[in-house]
Amino acid sequence: MKTKALYYLILFLNFSLLFSFKCGHDKIKKPPKILNDSIIIDDDSTRKLDDSYHSISFFIDYTQMNYNAYGTSDYRNFIKDSINSTIKVFGELLKVKRSGKISISNPAGCSERITRYDSSIKTGVDYDIILIPIIDPTLEDGVDAAASACYLSSDNRPIMGYVLLNQNYSYKKTNAQQFLTMLLLHEITHVLVFSDDLFDYFQYSDVTTTQTINGISRTLIQTPKVLSVASQHFGCSSITGIELENQGGEGSAGSHWEARIMLGDYMISTDYPEIVISDISLALFEDSGWYQVNYYTGGLFRFGKGQGCKFLESTCVSSGESNFEWDFCDESYENKCTSNNLNRGFCYMRIYSSLPAYYQYFSDSRTGGWEPVDYCPVTMSYSSSSYYFSGNCINGEIDDTKIYNLSSFGFKISDSSICIQSSLINSNDNSLSYYGYERAMCHKITCNSSDKTISVDIGETVIECPTDGGYMEVDGYNGTIRCPPYDRVCTSKTYVGDSISAALNHIPNEDIDSSYKASSGSITMKFNRIIISIFILFFLYI
């Protein structure tokens, strides 16, 4: 018992969880204004009105950001680079019908924060949407960004919006640009489509519905394409909608997916180490009636995949045990893989002062998991002071060497590695004793589509995992490795990495949805030092 306790204690003390993002969209949004005369059709316009579609284009106006001069020049340049990466992703994902130039007679009417702007916005810019980024020193702690649309065209599509970025964003972490790109994808989606103020302008009149689920009144999106792709993803033919977030108060509720069933999608209200762009979010773009959508990133979303209607309708944990072991956990601080098998982490549970009856899953009514997931316990990736999501198996930066020799476990971080549960220890390593404890380990894999098996590298040894997964022994090692099912990790051609890196770096022609015909192509969570002290004292007395 002491050995196991010491193992978890060392893990806990070596890695800190620094999730601090909370979206502030609903705190700044105002009902957008329709401008019937905002589109200019003239002989100089390269986008004369017709019925064809083209990749969405952005006019980014940095005038206000440069005028305010908040943050360092390095930070402002960092933001510009991240925005360029972000709009490239949207250019691959979305097409809009051609229009003329966009002319906004009163750009400052977009927000009281906008006092300076490019004069061409008033005369007309030959783009599909105008976006004004602003570094804002007034955003509250934990809110890294917020965004909103402000003007709509005569066909109700957003044509101007702004995004606020926290002056104190930690942009010097190793993979900070990837994280900010993820953040900008989220915020700009609020400008383009995902806002309860925009739902009123969708092509369908009944975008949302209200139902009681597990004793709680919920608001759900029920548009046709969302229902279709969600039914396929979850394996539930009778699905009636996808829930919107009901927690977090102003800023989160109503304009985000419910994290309990959409954890890992980029449109939940808080950051998570496996943010991807799901088919379900892409379907919302299509259902608006404003966009033609490329669905190539959606296969990367795996939370709740194939779990059936029960996943949508029942609780995550019953009588202290997870109802869905791939997606929820039930043992506090257990070293585990996150649900997409991309990150190493631990089962997040804690003691609250009190919990509502419908969020009580354990014998101790105060025990719960992560608040944004309806207090369900989920696996959270490790982070460090210098690296976002350092537990990632593709490009993580965890210094485990202080704990043990990684080669003894066949561990490998690479572009094609995933996280796999394993108790394997090299039988020739006399420095380690075998206790049978299962750990989250990174292993390089190859998906074999011909027979739906997975080749897993364990040190110099390669094993073949069967289609349905399961426990396997490995020559030269004590213990077993728990192979994941083929369909869980190999269903997408870009089966490793998140949708951001896939969108930026991995877009072979065969991965593009043929129907798209693309052209060239909050809750703030920080560990309190008191909790750490209690944790240490607990293990000292085991």
Name the predicted role of every residue range.
Residues T3-L11, N528-S533:
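Sec-dependent signal peptide recognition
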Residues Y8, R47-L49, G521:
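Compositionally biased non-globular segments, especially hydrophobic aliphatic-rich helices
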Residues F19-L183, V191-Y516:
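Extracellular zinc-dependent metalloprotease catalytic-domain scaffold
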Residues F12-D26, F538-I542:
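N-terminal signal peptide
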Residues D511-I530:
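C-terminal GPI-anchoring signal of eukaryotic secretory precursors
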Residues M262, F535-L537:
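Residue-level signal for pocket-adjacent positions within structured domains
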Residues M1-A5, Y541-I542:
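Positively charged n-region of N-terminal signal peptides that target proteins for export
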Residues I188:
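Extended, alpha-helix-rich binding/interface surfaces that flank or overlap catalytic cores
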